[in-house]
């Protein structure tokens, strides 16, 4: 079953490019050089996140840490969370060329029984 983005995620804009859980897991398992970025507050990141995830406290820190040709995957809590959509759009607008959204986010990852890291796990 393919998850559909929240209807507001596409209002007046191009659709958001996405990645499914199985492909993301394969990339992580294979050690591919992706940049997986959690688009939630620091406290949420510290509580739980997908292993290998990055977190940035402000956009300028993020933009200076990532190269425009990095493969970047953004996620947040679940398919209805728009933080990852906003981050996706900000990266695209800044000229990052390989950005996708893991729409299912933490809820989908945890629901599949996959490993999480953090102080609430």
Which functions belong to the PLM regions below?
Residues 54-60:
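Glycine-rich, highly charged phosphate/nucleotide-binding loops
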Residues 41, 59, 105-106:
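A generic "binding-loop/recognition-motif" signal
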Residues 63-110:
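Catalytic cysteine-centered active loop of the rhodanese-like fold, especially the PTP/DSP P-loop
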Residues 1-44, 120-121:
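Flexible, polar/low-complexity N-terminal or interdomain linker segments that lie immediately upstream
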Residues 113-121:
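Active-site neighborhoods of enzymes that stabilize oxyanions during catalysis
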Residues 30-36, 51-52, 71, 97-98:
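Short active-site oxyanion
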Residues 20, 57, 103:
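Short loop/edge segments at beta-strand edges and connector loops
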